[in-house]
From Swiss-Prot:
Residue stretches of biased makeup (Basic residues): 351-360
Organism per entry: Mus musculus (Mouse)
Protein name from the UniProt record: Growth/differentiation factor 7
Residue positions the entry lists as glycosylated: N79
Gene name of the record: Gdf7
Disulfide cysteine pairs (residue numbers): C360-C426, C389-C458, C393-C460
Length: 461
């Protein structure tokens, strides 16, 4: 094999690591799993790392920035009815840019935080009066994932009807599971309802309840809780509205009401290395299901065509990804020449081409999710800097390239007899994770950390 063929082979093998345009950047994402790096200017210059959330991290979530609010309020997502909860937006901003650490409670590192919005209707809540019921569809949680922490967050406003006895005896809040088939409800929390000077979110730890629900072999897909208020002596019930609780937004069903609904925040740890491509496939399945034509293709042909149009857009993006990954080798000769006439230069200019190309180093690679057609389900970031490795690995190899012994021997043989062995390849030697906030196939907002997303250093292998 001559030097030109060897270089072309290396470039083909590494095409997923060194794409040339926005669509080819999907090869990098497919090989790893993405996470966000949000910057106020939208430049995507840096990576984002996630910290496993402890109680302090959840409480420290900041108010979402203007760009996040505009994106949340828009209709650019795959499902226009999904309004990202402010808490999840704030959580992303709070955790972005921090290195992953162990969870504060000693449970270990978590890599996924999912926000499940309350799905209880006003009628179901009225049936629980004087309490309030909450219903969450947790079926999208993978059985292979370990639930590390679960927290129920309920909005409590300043009470319009202050309890006159609150100065002496504080009423109590009782949180329990919904009655099971035998009519048994399990009390989870009992605590005093402190007086409020303004609105705030009441947080309840429901980790044990969620874990028990998942262990039950015939568990419902819905996780149900009931919040009640009683007098200090727990002898008689109180209306939750007197303490500032109640149906969000007056039951108008608007965007404000959706953002004020109760939220079940579950932190989990995956047992296997996650790939972003798994989520992409789930998104594609959800898109196909949403775009299925009606049984009667009569007058509805127009709407079917519109649905297929959206479906075609996603297919085009994914097809472009596959095409870029596959054609990267075909363009590898010419693409490799971008560094100085390498792969496509042919055998005649072999020596000159090698001298003209730069040594193995890290190069810029900007990933724009809009170009990939993923901006309808990815909330943040809209873009990020992934970097890629490019250049020649010639003898003698520099120590900062951290070559393996095999790469050293192979490079030495190649320098002595190019036809005996190809040159070693410039590849990522060290990668770091980033995080991504997105809407999953079940329309839940998920904060997830993906490994091996940003090239930190390049080496010869």
């Amino acid at each position: 094999m001559d030097l030109s063929a060897a270089a072309a082979l290396c470039l083909w093998l590494l095409s997923a690591c060194r794409p040339r345009d926005g669509l080819e950047a999907a090869a990098v994402l497919r090989a790893a799993g993405a996470g966000p790096a949000w910057s106020p200017g939208g430049g995507g210059g840096g990576r984002t790392l996630a910290r496993a959330p402890g109680p302090s991290a959840l409480q420290a979530a900041a108010v979402p920035g203007p760009r996040a609010v505009r994106r949340a309020a828009g209709s650019g997502f795959r499902n226009g009815s999904v309004v990202p909860h402010h808490f999840m937006m704030s959580l992303y901003r709070s955790l972005a840019g921090r290195a992953p650490v162990a969870a504060a409670s000693g449970h270990g590192r978590v890599d996924t935080i999912t926000g499940f919005t309350d799905q209880a209707t006003q009628d179901e809540t009225a049936a629980a009066e004087p309490g309030q019921s909450f219903l969450f569809d947790v079926s999208s949680l993978s059985e292979a994932d370990e639930v590390v922490n679960a927290e129920l967050r309920v909005l409590r406003r300043r009470s319009p009807e202050p309890d006159r006895d609150s100065a002496t005896l504080l009423p109590r809040l009782l949180l329990s599971t919904c009655p099971d088939e035998a009519g048994t409800a399990h009390l989870l929390h009992s605590r005093a309802a402190e007086p409020l000077g303004g609105a705030r979110w009441e947080a309840f730890d429901v980790t044990d309840a969620v874990q028990s629900h998942r262990r039950w072999p015939r568990a419902s897909r819905k996780f149900c809780l009931v919040l009640r208020a009683v007098t200090a002596s727990e002898s008689s019930p109180l209306a939750l509205r007197r303490l500032g609780f109640g149906w969000p937004g007056g039951g108008d069903g608007g965007g404000t009401a959706a953002e004020e609904r109760a939220l079940l925040v579950i932190s989990s740890r995956t047992q296997r290395k996650e790939s972003l491509f798994r989520e992409i496939r789930a998104q594609a399945r959800a898109l196909r299901a949403a775009a299925e034509p009606p049984p009667d293709p009569g007058p509805g042909a127009g709407s079917r065509k519109a649905n297929l149009g959206g479906r075609r857009r996603r297919r085009t993006a994914l097809a472009g990804t596959r095409g870029a990954q596959g054609s990267g080798g075909g363009g590898g000769g010419g693409g490799g020449g971008g560094g100085g006439g390498g792969g496509g230069g042919g055998g005649a200019g072999r020596g000159h081409g090698r001298r003209g190309r730069s040594r193995c180093s890290r190069k810029s690679l900007h990933v724009d999710f809009k170009e990939l057609g993923w901006d309808d389900w990815i909330i943040a970031p809209l873009d990020y800097e992934a970097y890629h490795c490019e250049g020649v690995c010639d003898f003698p190899l520099r120590s900062h390239l951290e070559p393996t012994n095999h790469a050293i021997i192979q490079t030495l043989l190649n320098s002595m007899a190019p036809d005996a062995a190809p040159a070693s390849c410039c590849v990522p030697a060290r990668l770091s994770p980033i995080s991504i906030l997105y809407i999953d196939a079940a329309n839940n907002v998920v904060y997830k950390q993906y490994e091996d997303m940003v090239v930190e250093a390049c080496g010869c292998r």
